[in-house]
């Protein structure tokens, strides 16, 4: 018995400690700590998914590669002034952008009020006069912004329902609405997956709306970042110059920014014959068809 208890005592530190749990209208939410990391998890049908992790030692280093990758948008728009972020999570992306660009106006759209509260209580996210969280569906918010002819020069699409991106935020109609609120010199940064049954469909949909775009993938991450804008994409040389200028600011976040330009590709690596996603033809249809 003593040996068994001793063994359990040794195993306990290896398990993540749950410091918060709640069920929101949209999902089950858990906050855990383990090995100096605090993580936000959404509990979904296919298992728990880390949405955000931070280091608890006060370090500003970002934990996940995909979070670091999202800042590749700065290669296309180095000094954003008006930012829209769809999806809050733990608030890492808006927090870093607010530190890098303290004069930028940042609107964060989060449908789940519980997520916004957890980000504040456990992940040090704070709203300011220039950084505001709007509890709303991102598509509804963007539709209203378009009606008011508002423009953003840095748009991050990072909303996840748990298993995947909400299907109404994958369609041609939605991307056309995003296009309406994108400034002429702005950039769209979309976080999606590099290994997904929707990869080809997503790609042809972005291509239909925006034309050419950059794919950003790393072997260490299952995510891909889509980068696009209304004007012509910058050349690798221009992006290398911007990377050199911004690297000193990004170094403390552990972002290997100098290496990013050469990893962006505009090569078509998807099946061009795949069907464009629309409000009438969505991922739920694909799941039924496969």
Describe the residue ranges of each PLM region.
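C-terminal segment of classical bacterial N-terminal signal peptides
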Residues: 8-13
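The AdoMet/dcAdoMet-binding core of the Class I SAM-like
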Residues: 33, 61-184, 221
């Amino acid at each position: 018995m003593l040996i068994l208890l001793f063994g359990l005592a040794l195993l306990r530190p290896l398990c993540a400690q749950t410091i918060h749990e709640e069920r929101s209208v949209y999902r089950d939410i858990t906050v855990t700590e383990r090995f100096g990391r605090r993580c936000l998890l959404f509990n979904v049908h296919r298992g728990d998914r880390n949405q955000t992790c931070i280091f608890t030692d006060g370090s500003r280093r970002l934990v996940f590669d995909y979070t670091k990758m999202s800042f590749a948008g700065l290669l296309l728009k180095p000094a954003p002034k008006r930012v829209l972020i769809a999806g809050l999570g733990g608030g890492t992306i808006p927090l870093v952008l607010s530190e890098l660009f303290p004069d930028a106006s940042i609107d964060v759209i989060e449908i789940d009020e519980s997520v916004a509260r957890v980000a504040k209580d456990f992940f040090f996210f704070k709203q300011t006069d220039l950084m505001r969280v709007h509890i709303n569906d991102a598509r509804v918010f963007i539709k209203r912004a378009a009606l008011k002819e508002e423009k953003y020069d840095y748009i991050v699409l990072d909303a996840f329902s748990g298993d995947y991106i909400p299907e109404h935020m994958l369609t041609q109609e939605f991307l056309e609405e995003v296009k309406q609120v994108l400034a002429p010199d702005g950039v769209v940064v979309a976080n999606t997956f590099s290994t997904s049954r929707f990869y080809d469909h997503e790609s042809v949909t972005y291509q239909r709306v925006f034309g050419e775009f950059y794919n950003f993938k790393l072997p260490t991450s299952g995510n891909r970042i889509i980068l696009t804008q209304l004007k012509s994409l910058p050349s690798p040389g221009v992006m290398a110059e911007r990377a050199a200028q911004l690297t000193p600011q990004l170094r403390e976040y552990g972002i290997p920014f100098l290496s990013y330009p050469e990893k962006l590709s505009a090569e078509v690596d998807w099946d061009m014959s795949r069907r464009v996603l629309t409000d009438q033809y969505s991922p739920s249809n694909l799941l039924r068809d496969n």
